[in-house]
């Protein structure tokens, strides 16, 4: 198991269109495990393979309180079941510390396969429906800030840059404080 680096907005790789998974191989299963571990470590509820620079149609999510019920959707297809859209406040691991309302259908049908090749065909609503649509957007090169005004997109980009600089400095400070090995 390994933590994977998460791409940050506005990295152009986030705009790449994911290709379908032809077969659930051992490598795909390892990627799934690593994505779930990465999602938990980053305290997220969903992660698309595109966000970790693997441009295949694969998403993982876990909306459970105890973070013990991960779901895997391979080659997901979503169909809205209602015309009306509802606003939900969304955030994204690729757009750290930025949250804003996005309107999406509250009820959808999700068709996919799981990590064992079993078919998934479910009607879902609420946060699960929103999360699935958000992650599928990533597979299509769409980021939630694309739904926002130009001004909010610019603010999001600036905020992400600041957050990443702060994290980089904190990482350097942590590295400086770690004990250095003694010369023998």
Curated annotation (Swiss-Prot):
The active site is at 135. Keywords: Hydrolase, Iron, Metal-binding, Protein biosynthesis. InterPro entries: Peptide_deformylase, Peptide_deformylase_sf. It is an enzyme of class 3 (hydrolase). Its cofactor is Fe(2+). Disulfide bonds: none annotated. Binds 1 Fe(2+) ion. Gene3D superfamilies: Peptide deformylase. CDD domains: Pep_deformylase. Fe cation binds at residues 92, 134, 138. It comes from the Bacteria. Belongs to the polypeptide deformylase family. Removes the formyl group from the N-terminal Met of newly synthesized proteins. Requires at least a dipeptide for an efficient rate of reaction. N-terminal L-methionine is a prerequisite for activity but the enzyme has broad specificity at other positions. This is Peptide deformylase. It comes from Psychrobacter arcticus (strain DSM 17307 / VKM B-2377 / 273-4). The lineage of its organism: Bacteria, Pseudomonadati, Pseudomonadota, Gammaproteobacteria, Moraxellales.
């Amino acid at each position: 198991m390994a933590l994977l680096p998460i791409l940050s907005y506005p990295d152009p790789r986030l705009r790449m269109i994911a290709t379908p998974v032809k077969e659930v191989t051992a490598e795909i299963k390892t990627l799934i495990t690593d994505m779930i571990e990465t999602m938990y470590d980053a305290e997220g509820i969903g992660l698309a393979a595109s966000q970790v620079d693997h441009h295949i149609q694969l998403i993982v999510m876990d909306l459970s309180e105890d973070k013990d019920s991960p779901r895997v959707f391979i080659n997901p297809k979503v169909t809205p079941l209602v015309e009306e859209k509802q606003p939900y406040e969304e955030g994204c691991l690729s757009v750290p510390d930025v949250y804003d309302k996005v309107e999406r259908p509250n009820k959808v049908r999700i068709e996919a396969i799981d990590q064992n090749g079993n078919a998934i065909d479910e009607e879902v609503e609420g946060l699960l429906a929103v999360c699935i649509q958000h992650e599928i957007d990533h597979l299509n090169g769409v980021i939630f800030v694309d739904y926002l005004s130009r001004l909010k997109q610019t603010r999001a980009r600036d905020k992400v840059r600041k957050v990443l600089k702060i994290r980089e400095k904190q990482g350097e400070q942590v590295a400086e404080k770690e004990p250095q090995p003694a010369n023998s």
